[in-house]
């Protein structure tokens, strides 16, 4: 870390803690920041734009304009009694002359292409020509709407070509801007234009960078909003508090330079770190979003603070140096405060937005998990249990789409209410000033001189109003009126004393609801924070419980004098918990009373089964009154169901071994098993799990778990990993990814079967079946259908991508629906479905089609082992290994007529990995298809394995079990990939192929060197005690495994 960073690193932690607090209470922080910024926004804009102070009541019969403003818009003419000429006066001069005869001359032109149109009748008309009327009155009257005798409505318009005369608005804006910029030379204008172009490029880069890290719009918009809030707060501070206002022109010129210099790189880096951290976090780590935001700010905050402090010191220095230039000093002060507020808002407002983005990502990932599990055949109750476990670390209110909409609506509604009044007043002022009036000098008409008008012989002033145009009311005028009326009505309603208070109250209620939901979410977050401690307490409970059991069984023995443990309050609590649960989860009890069977049946029919003791429930099962498979549903306690089933089977099978704990059953999450992995559960089978590695695969290091009971298998694969790493690691290529299901159907005749095959092979048939199949799943996508005929039997092989799930159940659902559509919609009514699976898949059976066409993931893994490593690590030589591989794996397997078995022991590694990682063990039949190739390259050994049918998934099936899921976490591939569906399953297939590569390399080396038997004798025959059966002891049963843990 550089020296400047070291000096400010102590400032990072307060900012990181602030960011974590904001992430915990995002709605609170966002609302407070928006309210403060909105207050500053209203104050600043009212100061900079004075014309917004007009009342919005001009939508009446006559325009209600302030007299002073209307007087300024008129062209004034004066004639004294002693003169016959009219003198042009300014507004100030006309106001200084007092005369009782002051008239307003209005010129009204009716725009109509039809000369026969009936025009409205008007009062005070002194002259008319064609469709133009001149009105002379003592008060200005400009009606917005007139009605002719035939009912035609005429609407006031500046001209008849543009709605609201947007052209004039644009023209006046350009004129004002031109007047301001005329003071600059061309070089300055070029610099300003370049600054705005660079500003546009910076904004484009912001959206592009955010899109790359996973946000299409909202994070970019949030970054801009953060800077805008900082601008408004700094403008309010300098303008209202410090009385150092920066001119509007300086803001227009200087802000692009500030934005370009500072940029948005730090906000992009904060977002990138947070999203990448979220993607790297495995599902079961349960890290909270607030901790991710804390780490992001802690890692990136030093650079953020360093750069902002540098900018702030630069502006302060500039203000001191140029103190003789007030405009520049004020702008430097504004820039300084803008940086300060932007820094604070980055740790509050922007961090809160980031936390909400992460929460939404968690919701999305968890929803994908639940939908995938349900599509893969896991019952909804089990899927919900897993879904809740995955989302337990997230705030509860964000799981509800209604709550998300409520939070967003609160903020968006606030912004709309703030801007509606401003927008309405601005619209009204703009219409009045740029549409109805302009600064043109209007000449006095000639008819004034000869027209017989009373009082014109006296001292008189005539103020000529701008010419007004009226057009017949059309449809688009009505639409415009409706829009303006709605805006005006809402604006007036907001300003109403009662409604404004009601809206404020409603907004307060909205915030209170969000606060309530957030407080409710703390319960779930606190539960997850407490869960690690509760796990420790559970372990203590198990230890204390085991110790209690052993003590009760050996209480006749003398007490140990040297191992006494003091009793604490926690021990008392744990003992009470044990006593409360002992009656439910006890394996056997001699003191349990058993009621008559008839009474038990009667209670069961009244759904009182849960209130019976275990022996009574077991008695119902033994006597055939309660099915063995229905215990979980009836008892609503999966662990108790396992216990009762063991008691019942110990009687039915006359095997008291199930009463003991030699087959363990305690401390296991059977909720994940029920409906997903196994039925009639009586416990679980512990299998030793070893680990090999690290193994470098495509540049990434992995520790790979293996569950096996075969000695020296893990040690052998470990040696292979060491040799592969010495050569730089393994590289992989995935050539195919598609699970298959092969239904068989029958037609009455061969002609119809052949016609259906031709249709399915055609583009029309493929597209029709794809459309039907893809409609059944969010994840499964049909790639291709392969067909073949055997008599009138038609076999179809559906190849489908299934995301990160292995996907057999998912595909079966799509196949069933596709076959149904063929019968009902595509004209194959005479088709008979023989079986959804016609062994053309082929699943869990050796088949050449899997070896040739592939099934699941097709992976090729390769590694180059240096010659000296072959000698030093593998204790062999390159030529011997190449010769062995040809003779054994290629020629030997061919002589045996093997299909896909051109390897040494790929099934060993595949099965061990499948058991450890929750895969279907039966699918090792086709997943173990492998051909191992070796050749010598420049004295080194190049070895590869090609496995065309690895069938794996990282969600569903056995992966829902916590131990297997934890091993997937060890590899970093648990659950669905957050951004690229199927990436985790494909990576798992690569890892399995590389593990097979390591096992093949080590075993072939042992065979070439003649070490195989020796290694097995060493690892599997270490002592004679390992092979001895345990003998009963008079001192009591052996110590339980749970007690040792």
UniProtKB/Swiss-Prot annotation:
Region listing for Disordered, in residue ranges: 1018-1045
Impact when changing residue 262 to A: Leads to increased stability and reduced response to degradation signals
Any Pfam family the entry gives: HMG-CoA_red
The keyword Electron transport belongs to this UniProt entry's keyword annotation: no
Lumenal side of membrane: 46-186, 238-243, 323-324, 424-497
Residues modified as Phosphothreonine: 565
Gene disruption phenotype: When both HMG1 and HMG2 are deleted, cells are unable to undergo spore germination and vegetative growth.
Gene3D superfamilies per UniProt: 3-hydroxy-3-methylglutaryl-coenzyme A Reductase, Chain A, domain 2, HMGR, N-terminal domain, Hydroxymethylglutaryl-CoA reductase, class I/II, NAD/NADP-binding domain
Topological domains annotated Cytoplasmic: 1-24, 208-216, 265-301, 346-402, 519-1045
Assigned protein family: Belongs to the HMG-CoA reductase family.
Mutagenesis / variant outcome for changing residue 350 to A: Leads to increased stability and reduced response to degradation signals
Binding site residues for NADP(+): 777-779, 804-812, 1020-1021
Substrates-to-products reaction catalysed: (R)-mevalonate + 2 NADP(+) + CoA = (3S)-3-hydroxy-3-methylglutaryl-CoA + 2 NADPH + 2 H(+)
Organism the protein comes from: Saccharomyces cerevisiae (strain ATCC 204508 / S288c) (Baker's yeast)
Note: Present with 149 molecules/cell in log phase SD medium.
Membrane topology designation: Multi-pass membrane protein
Ranges for domain SSD: 188-356
EC number: 1.1.1.34
Sequence positions that bind CoA: 716-722, 873-875, 1015-1016
Class of enzymatic activity (EC top level): oxidoreductase
Record comment regarding domains: The sterol-sensing domain (SSD) is required for sterol pathway signals to stimulate hmg2 ER-associated degradation and detects both geranylgeranyl pyrophosphate and a secondary oxysterol signal.
Protein name: 3-hydroxy-3-methylglutaryl-coenzyme A reductase 2
Function: HMG-CoA reductase; part of the first module of ergosterol biosynthesis pathway constitutes by the early steps of the pathway, conserved across all eukaryotes, and which results in the formation of mevalonate from acetyl-coenzyme A (acetyl-CoA). HMG1 and HMG2 catalyze the reduction of hydroxymethylglutaryl-CoA (HMG-CoA) to mevalonate that is the rate-limiting step within the first mosule. The first module starts with the action of the cytosolic acetyl-CoA acetyltransferase ERG10 that catalyzes the formation of acetoacetyl-CoA.
């Amino acid at each position: 870390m550089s020296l400047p960073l070291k000096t400010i690193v102590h400032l990072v932690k307060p900012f990181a803690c602030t960011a974590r607090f904001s992430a915990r209470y995002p709605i609170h922080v966002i609302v407070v920041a928006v309210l403060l910024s909105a207050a500053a926004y209203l104050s600043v804009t009212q100061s900079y734009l004075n014309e917004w102070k007009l009342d919005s009541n001009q939508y009446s019969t006559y325009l209600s304009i302030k007299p002073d403003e209307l007087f300024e818009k008129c062209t004034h003419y004066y004639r004294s009694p002693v003169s016959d000429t009219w003198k042009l006066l300014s507004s100030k001069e006309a106001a200084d002359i007092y005369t009782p005869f002051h008239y307003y001359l209005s010129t009204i032109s009716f725009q109509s292409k039809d000369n026969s149109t009936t025009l409205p009748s008007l009062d005070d008309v002194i002259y008319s020509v064609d469709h133009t009327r001149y009105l002379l009155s003592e008060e200005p009257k400009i009606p917005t709407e007139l009605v002719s005798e035939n009912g035609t409505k005429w609407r006031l318009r500046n001209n008849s070509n543009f709605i609201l005369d947007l052209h004039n608005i644009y023209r006046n804006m350009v004129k004002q801007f031109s007047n301001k910029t005329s003071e600059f030379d061309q070089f300055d204008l070029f610099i300003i234009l370049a600054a705005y172009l660079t500003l546009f490029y910076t904004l484009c880069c912001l959206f592009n960078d955010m899109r790359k890290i996973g946000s299409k719009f909202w994070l970019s918009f949030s970054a801009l909003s953060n800077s805008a809030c900082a601008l408004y707060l700094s403008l309010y501070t300098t303008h209202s508090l410090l009385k150092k206002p920066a001119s509007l022109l300086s803001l227009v010129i200087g802000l692009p330079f500030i934005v370009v210099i500072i940029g948005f790189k730090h906000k992009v880096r904060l977002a990138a770190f947070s999203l990448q951290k979220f993607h790297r976090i495995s599902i079961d780590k349960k890290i909270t979003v607030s901790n991710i935001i804390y780490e992001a700010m802690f890692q990136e905050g030093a650079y953020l603070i360093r750069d902002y402090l540098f900018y702030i010191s630069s502006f302060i220095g500039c203000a001191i140096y140029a103190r003789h230039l007030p405009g520049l000093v004020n702008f430097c002060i504004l820039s300084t405060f803008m940086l300060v507020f932007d820094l604070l808002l980055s740790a509050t407002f922007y961090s809160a937005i980031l936390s909400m983005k992460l929460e939404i990502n968690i919701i999305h990932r968890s929803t994908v998990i639940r939908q995938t599990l349900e599509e893969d055949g896991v019952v909804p109750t089990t899927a919900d249990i897993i879904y809740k476990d995955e989302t337990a670390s997230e705030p509860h209110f964000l799981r509800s789409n209604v709550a998300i909409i409520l939070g967003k609506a609160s903020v968006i509604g606030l912004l709309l209410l703030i801007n509606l009044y401003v927008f309405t007043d601005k619209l009204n002022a703009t219409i009045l000033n740029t549409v109805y009036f302009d600064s043109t000098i209007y000449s006095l008409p000639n008819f004034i001189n000869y027209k017989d008008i009373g009082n014109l012989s006296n001292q008189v002033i005539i103020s000529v109003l701008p010419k007004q145009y009226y057009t017949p009311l059309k449809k688009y005028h009505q639409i415009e009126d409706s829009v303006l009326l709605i805006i005006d009505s809402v604006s007036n309603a907001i300003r109403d004393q009662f409604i404004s208070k009601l809206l404020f109250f409603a907004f307060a209620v909205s915030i209170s609801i969000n606060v309530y939901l957030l407080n409710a979410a703390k319960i779930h977050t606190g539960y997850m924070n407490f869960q690690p401690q509760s796990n420790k307490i559970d372990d203590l409970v198990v230890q204390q419980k085991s110790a209690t059991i052993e003590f009760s069984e050996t209480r006749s023995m003398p007490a140990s004098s040297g191992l006494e443990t003091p009793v604490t309050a926690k021990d008392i609590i744990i003992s009470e918990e044990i006593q409360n649960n002992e009656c439910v989860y006890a394996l056997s009890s001699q003191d349990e009373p058993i009621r008559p069977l008839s009474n038990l049946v009667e209670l069961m029919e009244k759904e009182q089964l849960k209130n019976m003791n275990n022996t009574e429930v077991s008695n119902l099962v033994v006597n055939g009154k309660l099915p063995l498979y229905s215990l979980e549903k009836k008892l609503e306690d999966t662990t108790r169901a396992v216990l009762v089933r063991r008691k019942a089977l110990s009687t039915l099978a006359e095997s008291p071994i199930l009463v003991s704990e030699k087959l363990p059953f305690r401390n296991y999450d059977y909720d994940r098993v029920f409906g997903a992995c196994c039925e009639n559960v009586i416990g679980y089978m512990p299998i030793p799990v070893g680990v090999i590695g690290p193994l470098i695969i495509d540049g990434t290091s992995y520790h790979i778990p293996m569950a096996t009971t075969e000695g020296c298998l893990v040690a052998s694969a470990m040696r292979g990993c060491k040799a592969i790493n010495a050569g730089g690691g393994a590289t992989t290529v995935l050539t195919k990814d598609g699970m298959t299901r092969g239904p068989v159907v029958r037609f009455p005749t061969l002609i119809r079967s052949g016609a259906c095959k031709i249709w399915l092979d055609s583009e029309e048939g493929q597209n029709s079946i794809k459309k039907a199949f893809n409609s059944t799943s969010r994840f499964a996508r049909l790639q291709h259908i392969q067909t073949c005929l055997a008599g009138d039997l038609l076999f179809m092989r559906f190849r489908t991508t299934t995301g990160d799930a292995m996907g057999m159940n998912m595909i079966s659902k799509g196949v069933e629906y596709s076959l149904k559509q063929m019968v009902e919609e595509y004209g194959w009514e005479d088709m008979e479905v023989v079986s959804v699976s016609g062994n053309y898949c082929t699943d869990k059976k050796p088949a050449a089609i899997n070896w040739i066409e592939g099934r699941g993931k097709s992976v090729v893994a390769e590694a180059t082992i240096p010659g000296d490593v072959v000698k030093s690590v593998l204790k062999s030589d390159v030529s011997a290994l190449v010769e062995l591989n040809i003779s054994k794996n290629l020629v030997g397997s061919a002589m045996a007529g093997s299909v896909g078995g051109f390897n040494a022991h790929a099934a060993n590694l595949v099965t061990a990995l499948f058991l450890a990682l929750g895969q279907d063990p039966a699918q090792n039949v086709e997943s173990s298809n492998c051909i191992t190739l070796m050749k010598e390259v420049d004295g080194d050994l190049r070895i590869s394995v090609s496995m065309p049918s690895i069938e794996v998934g990282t969600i569903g099936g056995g992966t829902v079990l916590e131990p297997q899921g934890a091993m997937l976490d060890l590899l970093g591939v648990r659950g669905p990939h957050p951004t690229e569906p199927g990436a985790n399953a494909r990576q798992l297939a690569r890892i399995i192929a590389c593990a097979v590569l390591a096992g093949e390399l080590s075993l072939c080396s042992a065979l070439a060197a003649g070490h195989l038997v020796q290694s097995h004798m060493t690892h599997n025959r270490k002592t004679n005690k390992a092979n001895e059966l345990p003998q009963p002891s008079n001192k009591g049963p052996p110590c339980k495994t749970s007690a040792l843990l």
